[in-house]
């Protein structure tokens, strides 16, 4: 409500806005600020007046799912599920204080599932920007570390168009992001036994890892919820809007 009110106070036609709240992410007249999802981000983002900065969980989900939907590999009616692990900084000042209190409860030392009503505030943008007919069944989890995210979608390959293997899906995503300075796809042959959610903490990059076999695939996006999942994306969008180098001021 505050963001809507603030934008309403603008009385001229040349002020440009990047809104980091949820208020305008699916609103008419606003451009969704995920440059890598556009064929010409310098044009789409660079000329926009109103940019809605993506949500952190939505960033990971869309990085994995949106290209596959756009390329017609992922059917629009596919019943997607998504699991997303975040550090506690994603919960804002109140949650940070809870986790950093000296007398915090024992439950705060373990991962905690939330959003169990399946009405998370990022679902609307997840569905709209991916172009899916329904939002994913989304399970967010917060854990006892400060920053970093790992967002994963799960796929049954036989329901995808062309029935690609996990290796082929990795190549498809790698080709899609080949020229992007801030989003990359790990080589399929480089599959660690563990994927640490805080591996990219302190950076503004996002890395996709595709794992699985002929029948099933998981695609995991790892990034910093405070970087590519928040302020890093805002700076990237600002750079494009001002005609600067896209990565200016960002940590690669």
How should these model regions be labeled?
Residues 178, 197-252:
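C-terminal helical cap and adjacent loop that interface with cofactors, partners, or active-site loops
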Residues 19-22, 184-189, 249-252:
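A generic structural motif
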Residues 63, 67, 125-129, 233, ...:
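Alpha-helical scaffold segments in soluble metabolic enzymes
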Residues 79, 83, 88-219:
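C-terminal substrate-binding/catalytic lobe of Rossmann-fold NAD(P)-dependent oxidoreductases
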Residues 1-114, 211-213, 248:
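N-terminal Rossmann-like NAD(P) cofactor-binding subdomain of oxidoreductases
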Residues 67-71, 156, 240-244:
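Active-site catalytic microenvironments for nucleophilic, acid-base chemistry
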